[in-house]
Regions:
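Residue-level recognition of specific faces of alpha-helices
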Residues: 16-19, 50, 63, 101, ...
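Phosphate-/nucleic-acid-contacting segments
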Residues: 115-158
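Cyclic-nucleotide recognition modules
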Residues: 37-96
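Alpha-helical bundle regulatory/interaction domains
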Residues: 79-95, 99-105, 110-114, 118, ...
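Regulatory nucleotide-sensing modules
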Residues: 1-18, 22
Length: 158
């Protein structure tokens, strides 16, 4: 994908699972037609999909866009299903992958409502330090649910 190109577009059914070999992909949704809210940024060696859309075959509620030129290995859902029925090890891998993604989403959801902005910031620094080295701070502040100004203050305090 080239910078700015979409892997998933809000309103379209996501039929692909991707693996990021290199680059950065931003998961975001638009609120009130103009306000982008970043939910995650994937770096290399991660899988990407709009899971709700991909699994349930419904229109995506989020966008996944390349923040940088990116190399993505893509597999169609029908091919994933075929491989699962043909290769038991692939099925086991796929189940573990989806379980891991669901746990990450659940943890993120709970952390967002139970932790303070400072606690979320510290946790993200520990769990994903590369984000702070590679991703523009505007996306990190959006992921944390705070303004760029608040993030700047947190960085000075911590």
């Amino acid at each position: 994908l080239t910078k700015g190109e979409y892997f998933v577009k809000e309103g379209k059914v996501a039929t692909q699972l991707g693996f990021v070999e290199s680059g950065q992909l931003q998961f975001y949704t638009t609120v009130n037609q103009y306000d982008e809210r970043t939910t995650y940024v994937s770096l290399e060696n991660t899988f990407v999909a709009s899971l709700l859309s991909y699994i349930n075959e419904v229109p995506a509620r989020e966008n996944i866009r390349a923040l940088t030129d990116s190399v993505i290995w893509i597999i169609e859902k029908k091919d994933v299903c075929n491989l699962q029925s043909q290769i038991s090890a692939f099925k086991d891998f796929y189940i573990k992958l989806i379980e891991y993604q669901l746990c990450c989403i659940d943890k993120s959801r709970l952390d967002f409502i139970t932790l303070s902005a400072q606690e979320r910031y510290l946790q993200l620094q520990i769990q994903e330090p590369r984000l702070f080295q590679e991703v523009p701070l505007q996306y990190i502040s959006s992921m944390l649910g705070i303004s760029p100004r608040h993030l700047s203050r947190l960085r000075k305090v911590v």
